[in-house]
Every structure is written in C-alpha cells, then in structure tokens.
C-alpha cells in the first residue's frame, strides 16, 4: 500500500472556507478530486488543487524509490484535513480614534493519498460486544 502525504502551511485562506473545499474531495479518487477542484468556484480550491497534485507527484516518487508499480488511477484521498494556523492581527481605524481588530486567519492543509489494499478491502466484521449490562 502506497501512502503519500502533502502539506501546505500558513496558507492565507480561512480554515472554515478551506474545510468546505476539503470536504468535497475526501474519499474520492485523486483524478476525480482534481477535476472537482478545477471547476470549484471557491477561492480555497486553487491551493487544495496544487496540494493534491503535489501528493500525486509524491506518490509517484515514493513508488519509484521503492521499485513498485503505481497506477495513479488507484490513488484516492484517504485523509484530508485543515488545521488552523497563525492568525495575523490587523487594525481597522474607526471613528473617534477607535480601532477595530481584523483577524486574518491562516490554514494548515494536509492531504493523504493511498492505494486501496486487499486487506483493507476485505475488512473483517467488527465483533459484537458480549459484555452484559448490569440489571437492577
């Protein structure tokens, strides 16, 4: 199972808006995710598009280094998440000498691509809990 990780840090997109875009591609095939992101109207779709393309390239390099065959059609977005980065604090001058604070938020975006493994495809059924409840 090939797994490749790509991260971008301190990207100037608010985490809430980035999560909206990342939620669209989670669980999809990598090529399908690129197609979705290419035509998504959100501003956060451009950095996420570049990140998925980088993760595909990372998987290709990782497969070459380990001398394994990698079919890029098999790659899918196994995990994708957005964490909040540092917040740039700016001030907006207001009337009568006041100042309002403006928070310019940043995001750390992580995308993990993986190939489906035969062991994962045939996951064993979870065992039912056999613990008995205490009766009064």
UniProtKB/Swiss-Prot annotation:
InterPro entries associated with the record: Ribosomal_uL22 (IPR001063), Ribosomal_uL22_bac/chlpt-type (IPR005727), Ribosomal_uL22_bac/org-type (IPR047867), Ribosomal_uL22_CS (IPR018260), Ribosomal_uL22_sf (IPR036394)
Domain of life, per lineage: Bacteria
Signal peptide: none
UniProt keyword Amino-acid biosynthesis present: no
Single GO cellular component term: cytosolic large ribosomal subunit
Any one GO MF annotation of this record: rRNA binding
Keyword Ribosomal protein: yes
One of the protein's GO biological processes: translation
One Pfam family, short name: Ribosomal_L22
Keywords in alphabetical order: Ribonucleoprotein, Ribosomal protein, RNA-binding, rRNA-binding
Family: Belongs to the universal ribosomal protein uL22 family.
Function: This protein binds specifically to 23S rRNA; its binding is stimulated by other ribosomal proteins, e.g. L4, L17, and L20. It is important during the early stages of 50S assembly. It makes multiple contacts with different domains of the 23S rRNA in the assembled 50S subunit and ribosome.
Subunit structure: Part of the 50S ribosomal subunit.
Stated name of the protein: Large ribosomal subunit protein uL22
Organism field: Leifsonia xyli subsp. xyli (strain CTCB07)
Gene giving rise to this polypeptide: rplV
